[in-house]
């Protein structure tokens, strides 16, 4: 059996008196895209810092690429590429120079580093921007350059922290296509994201954490079927509490978030009949998705 590229076992981390990671366990299989989801403050960033050996756990065990962390984190990181949440590209360098300089951090010779640049530029679709300064790039181009830079050491594992935050839909879809191509090449990916569509499209499995604890784990479709299992009618109106009292008898379950009432239904027709022709209301009937799972598990929207 091959060694899991990432393995967390009963990991804990405290800051002062607050337990920010509480007995967290998960593992990532070779060639898998594994998502780590949770609201702000759930412990995702601390988890990534412990994985990379930047922060030391107070209890539990961590291994990365078969190496114990933090004791051999430096060795493990030689086989890891990291895309941070915020771009840390060098603005004084060109696109090409950013790749060349970063390659030298991994001990590559100047000749080997120069040989890497053309295929990385092609991968990032930045061939025409090789000699442009970072400040001349769009947000999507910067994210693709950061991803290309993370590949200079041909890593086995990629750790991506919010890889498409701040990108427009077109740039986000291009980033997803690049990530899928890496999975097709056998790379292992751990990613945090606030975008449920992103998690559903990319992740083979995911783990939802809240207050440092794992509250669900599994394939996206499995979680949707287990936690929701039916269609959803979203109703937008001025008095969701009154609407809930009226429509609850015709739904399997109802939830309110802001001014929106969510009705989870096996048969939508009774609710459709009662909403038809009403003024001041908007509603949408759709299949259940990961956003519904998140709301169900945490009681909060993802972006809080």
From Swiss-Prot:
Domain of life: Bacteria
GO cellular component: plasma membrane
GO molecular function: ATP binding; ATP hydrolysis activity; transmembrane transporter activity
CDD domains in alphabetical order: ABC_subfamily_A (cd03263)
SMART domains named among the record's database cross-references: AAA
Positions bound to ATP: 38-45
Entry's localization field: Cell inner membrane
Enzyme class: translocase
Topology in the lipid bilayer: Peripheral membrane protein
Keywords for this protein: ATP-binding, Cell inner membrane, Cell membrane, Membrane, Nodulation, Nucleotide-binding, Translocase, Transport
Enzyme Commission number(s): 7.6.2.-
PROSITE patterns xref list: ABC_TRANSPORTER_1 (PS00211), ABC_TRANSPORTER_2 (PS50893), NODI (PS51240)
Chief subcellular location: membrane
ABC transporter domain ranges (all copies): 6-236
Family: Belongs to the ABC transporter superfamily. Lipooligosaccharide exporter (TC 3.A.1.102) family.
Subunit annotation: The complex is composed of two ATP-binding proteins (NodI) and two transmembrane proteins (NodJ).
Function: Part of the ABC transporter complex NodIJ involved in the export of the nodulation factors (Nod factors), the bacterial signal molecules that induce symbiosis and subsequent nodulation induction. Nod factors are LCO (lipo-chitin oligosaccharide), a modified beta-1,4-linked N-acetylglucosamine oligosaccharide. This subunit is responsible for energy coupling to the transport system.
Protein name from the UniProt record: Nod factor export ATP-binding protein I
Organism: Burkholderia pseudomallei (strain K96243)
Protein encoded by which gene: nodI
């Amino acid at each position: 059996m091959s060694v899991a590229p990432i393995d967390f076992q009963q990991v804990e981390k405290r800051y002062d008196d607050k337990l920010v990671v509480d007995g967290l366990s998960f593992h990532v299989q070779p060639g898998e895209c594994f998502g780590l989801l949770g609201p702000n403050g759930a412990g995702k960033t601390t988890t990534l810092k412990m994985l990379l050996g930047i922060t030391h756990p107070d209890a539990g065990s961590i291994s990365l690429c078969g190496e114990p962390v933090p004791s051999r984190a430096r060795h493990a990181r030689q086989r890891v590429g990291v895309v941070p949440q915020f771009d840390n590209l060098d603005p004084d360098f060109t696109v090409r120079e950013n790749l060349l300089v970063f390659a030298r951090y991994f001990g590559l010779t100047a000749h080997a580093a120069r040989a890497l640049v053309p295929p990385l530029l092609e991968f990032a679709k930045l061939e025409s921007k090789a000699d442009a300064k970072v400040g001349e790039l769009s947000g999507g181009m910067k994210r693709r350059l950061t991803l290309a830079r993370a590949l200079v050491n041909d890593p086995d594992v990629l750790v991506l922290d919010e890889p498409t935050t701040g990108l427009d839909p077109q740039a986000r879809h291009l980033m997803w296509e690049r990530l899928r191509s890496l999975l097709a090449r056998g790379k292992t990916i751990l990613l945090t994201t606030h975008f449920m569509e992103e998690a559903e499209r990319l992740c083979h499995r995911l783990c939802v954490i809240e207050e440092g604890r794992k509250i669900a784990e599994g394939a996206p479709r499995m979680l949707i079927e287990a936690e929701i299992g039916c269609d959803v009618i979203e109703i937008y109106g001025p008095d969701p509490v009154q609407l809930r009292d009226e429509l609850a008898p015709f739904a399997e379950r109802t939830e309110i978030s802001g001014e929106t009432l969510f009705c989870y239904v096996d048969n939508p027709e009774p609710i459709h009949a009662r909403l038809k022709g009403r003024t001041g209301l908007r509603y949408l009937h759709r299949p259940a998705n990961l956003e519904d799972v998140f709301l169900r598990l945490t009681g909060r929207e993802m972006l809080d």
